[in-house]
Amino acid sequence: MPNRRRRKLSTAMSAVAALAVASPCAYFLVYESTETTERPEHHEFKQAAVLTDLPGELMSALSQGLSQFGINIPPVPSLTGSGDASTGLTGPGLTSPGLTSPGLTSPGLTDPALTSPGLTPTLPGSLAAPGTTLAPTPGVGANPALTNPALTSPTGATPGLTSPTGLDPALGGANEIPITTPVGLDPGADGTYPILGDPTLGTIPSSPATTSTGGGGLVNDVMQVANELGASQAIDLLKGVLMPSIMQAVQNGGAAAPAASPPVPPIPAAAAVPPTDPITVPVA
């Protein structure tokens, strides 16, 4: 008898324990099944630096460093990418000719004779009637100078046809040498070192391995270095070197101001010599 009671008690305790363990699991399963879908989370991604961002990063670092000293750099359109883009929206005739010239799509709107030939005026004999032709006028349309040499203009009599050498400011003399380009200065076309380079030479590659975005200059050299180091490393290197160098240059410029030299003492005036009376010598 006691064994039966113990079995029943153990069975009841086992059932209660199983229910206590299974009830939370069942609750979470039912809750997850009845819960609506979660809202998608929006993550902000930052675009990695690329090689094309190097000129913009360089100009922004320069503008931030120079703005502290009151120097503002104007924006450069070629670096910001704000080029003039021509689309077909400004000129409808380029994309849809029918919007500007209806005669191209519907010829009957402009010339009724193309659709209804009977509308054109037909007068039989008006153009081909005999006797209606005009007699030719002798001499009309002919150049008298071709038959009479005396009517032609002599050579040099018309000053408006030619300009003597030296009278036209736009034309130089025969032996004149232009002095706009200094001799011996090779960095640029006009003797200056270009900063942004020549945009007309942008399609010429500097080497088979690397290509440049300009025709030479400081930015072109920086772009070539960036191709070798990588965009991110080059930007970090410029930011780490550019700002300290600017601050150090400004501090050295202020500290290197020469001190004022002491004033030169005035030269003392020479002592005045008293005048001497002439010696009178008696004459014998």
Swiss-Prot record:
GO cellular component terms attached to this protein's record: extracellular region; plasma membrane
Biased composition annotated in UniProt, kind: Polar residues: 145-165
Transmembrane intervals: 253-273
Region annotated 6 X 5 AA tandem repeats of P-[GA]-L-T-S, chain positions: 92-121
UniProt xrefs under InterPro entries: XGLTT_repeat
Segments of skewed composition (Low complexity): 86-110, 202-212
Signal sequence extent: 1-22
Annotated region described as Disordered, given as residue ranges: 80-216
Region: 6 X 5 AA approximate tandem repeats of P-[ATG]-[LG]-X-X, residue numbers: 144-173
This protein's record includes keyword Membrane: yes
Keywords: Cell membrane, Membrane, Repeat, Signal, Transmembrane, Transmembrane helix
Effect of residue 256 to V: In strain: MT103
Cytoplasmic face residues: 274-284
Localization (cell): Cell membrane
Membrane topology per record: Single-pass type I membrane protein
Sequence repeat start and end residues: 92-96, 97-101, 102-106, 107-111, 112-116, 117-121, 144-148, 149-153, 154-158, 159-163, 164-168, 169-173
Residue intervals annotated with topology Extracellular: 23-252
Annotated family: To M.leprae 28 kDa antigen.
Primary role: Surface-exposed protein required for multiplication and intracellular growth.
Protein name, UniProt field: Exported repetitive protein
Taxonomic source organism: Mycobacterium tuberculosis (strain ATCC 25618 / H37Rv)
